[in-house]
Amino acid sequence: MDRIQITDDLSFSQIIYGMWRLGDDTDTSQSHVQAKVEACLAQGITTMDQADIYGGYTAEALFGETLKAAPALRDQIEIVTKCDIVAPVGRHSGARVKYYDTSAAHITASVEASLRDMNIDVIDCLLIHRPDPLMDAMETGEVLDDLIASGKVRTVGVSNFKPWDFSLLQSAMENELVANQIELSATNHTPFTDGDLAFLQENDIPVMAWSPLGGGSIFDNAAVMNVLNRVAGEAGVEPSAVAVAFLLRHPARIAPVMGTNNISRINALSDALKVKLDRQTWFEIYTAALGREVA
């Protein structure tokens, strides 16, 4: 599997395994979580995407049980996690409202909790999960730089940031923001034309695409499915693999974040790499999603 270079000494797999549903599985045993990770590794999927809030602040600890039981796995993977969303559940059950917190104190406490819960010494990439209207860029930028200097975090990036949010935070930092994780799929295609991907390409910033199947909406779109089914039949893969290949075809260095608890589906995640879309086929999918031909 191809790699996406993040820094001189850090790269991500072209497909990333998303762990946001880890706590929703009917089997949350350590052995089952380990089986998922090993199924990913067998295909060259080495990058694991987490967030402190996933599973109501439980998913990192579930993952940590596997890293504690099988510590050799740590050297085979890259761990991405996120912070700044505070929801009134779990460790934040006393909160009165769901909110964002990019204060130095909260980010530092979140990193310490993530390190402890996942049984690791360093986070490979820490993302600010959502833009915070109350973000003091100087304070947030300084604490992110400090976390890198401390050795607790290797790199930092953002998630769901618009170009202006990204530029604001970057202006207050010494280290480079190395990625932006955004919602992107054939059916959620506005980043192709609203400036989001153009900004990231211009600045050579890798893109992590969450919900690359549109939260399942792709399968409800008859026009899109007609094209996906045809191409899937020709390539001998499932339509979902074609939907992922649609993102991989773009030149913006997009790494789809795929989340499933089904081992057989995990085993098929790399099938997207078998699909090579030419320009016309890509536009067939795109125009089917648009509901009209391009101008």
Regions found by a protein language model. Name each.
Residues D8-D25, V80-K98, L127:
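N-terminal small/glycine-rich loop or linker at the start of catalytic domains
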Residues D27-C40, T102-M118, W164-S167, F192-G195:
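Short, acidic/polar
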Residues T28-H32, T58, L62, A95-H106, ...:
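Alpha-helix N-cap and loop-to-helix initiation/capping positions
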Residues P131-A295:
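Beta/alpha (TIM)-barrel catalytic core signal, keyed to glycine-rich beta->alpha loops juxtaposed to Asp/Glu
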Residues T7-D8, T66-D75, L115-N119, I148, ...:
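Acidic (Asp/Glu)-rich catalytic clusters
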Residues M1-I77:
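N-terminal binding-site loop/beta-alpha segment at the start of enzyme catalytic domains
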Residues L115-P133:
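Active-site groove signature of glycoside hydrolases
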